[in-house]
Amino acid sequence: MVFSKISQVAHYTPKQVISNDDLSQIMDTSHEWISSRTGIEKRHISTVEMTSDLAIRVAEQLLAGSGYDATALDFIIVATISPDASMPSTAAKVQAAIGATNAFAFDMTAACSGFVFALAMADKLIASGAYQRGLVIGAETLSKIIDWQDRSTAVLFGDGAGGVLLEASEQQHFLAEALHTDGARGQSLTSGQSSLRSPFSQGQEVNSFLQMDGRAIFDFAIRDVSRSITAIIEQSGLAKEELDYLLLHQANRRILDKMAKKIGMPREKFLENMMHYGNTSAASIPILLSESVQNGQLKLDGSQHILLSGFGGGLTWGSLIVKI
């Protein structure tokens, strides 16, 4: 059998940093109000670079670290809800920029679960035996879909990208997965809504900014996502103590606090960096993964078990247990 493994990680964020105090200059808020409710202290905001630019930087780092030429790639998947355009896809732009002429490329739209969904799909591509290696990237410029007059959402989000190089392995590294969608609750978190516009329709004005029912999303994370994580740990056959770290979507520190209690695991095993980046949707988990390798918490030598879990718009949620 053919399996897959994560062999390289990388991340990139725009240079412009916006602190909570900076936000207090343009809206009715304060550092204390934001940090006490979310754990977020600052975020990176793109002033020039588009989502594809961030993803390209990550792709270049992944290739440089691996020593592979871009022509050795078989596929590129970019998870994003803030693409440069509806078409061409962000992944296609990455493919062109790095010269990955042998790779097929497509975008994955699953909001804050996007990276986990994309990684699960990439694992299956390699396990099929038809493909040897590819890039899985989460990239967002959420600053362009935020209503900067809406304090309830503007303080939460940031821009950035992270990703992995996935390649074939003789050993199994992806040990368990659980992917979920509940479209019936989709209106709890929306963005990019558009109306019918043609000579034959009577389109109506819609709000295209990101809109969120914060309480509904909070309750969903604590209830449904915690239950799913508990189930996937049982499915994997691992004891909770055998999990070295949990890397969850970086939405809100209060969510992580409550989920740790609900799942029954030590809070210190839940890695976090939302204080530096805010919520970067599909980019949050790969940025956290890359930083954790960079700072030595994760070894990338096959000796650790980690759980990756994303949750957000759709509603979607999904988890993977990976030997890394």
Swiss-Prot record:
The active site is at C112, H249, N279. Residues 250-254 are annotated as: ACP-binding. It is found in: Cytoplasm. It is an enzyme of class 2 (transferase). This is Beta-ketoacyl-[acyl-carrier-protein] synthase III. GO terms for molecular function: 3-oxoacyl-[acyl-carrier-protein] synthase activity; beta-ketoacyl-acyl-carrier-protein synthase III activity. Catalyzes the condensation reaction of fatty acid synthesis by the addition to an acyl acceptor of two carbons from malonyl-ACP. Catalyzes the first condensation reaction which initiates fatty acid synthesis and may therefore play a role in governing the total rate of fatty acid production. Possesses both acetoacetyl-ACP synthase and acetyl transacylase activities. Its substrate specificity determines the biosynthesis of branched-chain and/or straight-chain of fatty acids. Keywords: Acyltransferase, Cytoplasm, Fatty acid biosynthesis, Fatty acid metabolism, Lipid biosynthesis, Lipid metabolism, Multifunctional enzyme, Transferase. GO terms for cellular component: cytoplasm. Its main location: cytoplasm. Pathway: Lipid metabolism; fatty acid biosynthesis. Homodimer. The last Arg residue of the ACP-binding site is essential for the weak association between ACP/AcpP and FabH.
